[in-house]
Amino acid sequence: MNILEKIIEETKNTIQKSKAKKSLHNLEELSEQYTKREFIKSIQNKISLNQSAIIAEIKKASPSKGIIRDEFNPIEIATDYEKNGASCLSVLTDKPFFKGDIDYLDLIRKEVEIPLLRKDFIVDEYQIIETKAFGADCLLLIVAALDKFQLKDFFDYATSINLDVLVEVHNLDELETALTISPNLIGINNRNLSTFEVSIQNSIDLKDNIPEKVTLISESGINNASVSYTHLRAHETRE
């Protein structure tokens, strides 16, 4: 069993516990309290100004690195990101492997104005309405974690309740599957979720297979200005 499979198995256990605490009806009522912030448009606005559109990540830990930040204050991190020009925030909500918490979404939303992405392993429709109920504007669908029928059903449900969707791929086969649902936003993850190895070349290799009308996000491995510049130049040369 690889890392992704272990995470999915544990995620399913977490979902059962969540369902016991809050019903779908409860979540639907909670979801009505938020006005959507436009996640995709926030990114596109920066791109239209020829600026880097950064989705800044709020993450305490990961399976590959362990604890990343001992003194972890998600609100302080979020407000710092916003002050320094982030377009959007990506909030890890997986608890067993990333030490996240879904409550971070609501806490952070109250302190910032920019849109929020719930970054988690979505494998059940319950998580989709849960995402909206806790204040996220966008959710992540990982093609490697879903079959093609789940991908379409989850995408359709999320968009029907006015959530933006970031569809994540890791290779050409997954990209071809993603394109069958006509997403507006595709993320190429430079991290292999089976091994957790990172190569930014992954984005450069796959980018030309994505239609120009689709907003492209490069994920993972961008940790300094030089790498960011390389990705910006690669993006500009898309056919």
Language-model features: locations:
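Conserved N-terminal beta1-alpha1 strand-loop-helix module at the mouth
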Residues: 1-105, 110-114, 157, 163-182, ...
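Hydrophobic faces of well-ordered beta-strands that scaffold small-molecule active sites
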Residues: 54-56, 89, 116-119, 139-141, ...
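Alpha-helical segments flanking ligand/cofactor-binding loops in enzyme cores
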Residues: 79, 106, 129, 152, ...
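Active-site-proximal loop/helix of nucleotide/amide-processing enzymes and allied scaffolds
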Residues: 100, 117-119, 125-127
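Conserved anion-binding
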Residues: 123-195
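Catalytic core of soluble alpha/beta enzymes
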Residues: 170-216, 221-229
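Conserved small/polar residues in nucleotide/adenosyl-binding loops
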Residues: 230-239
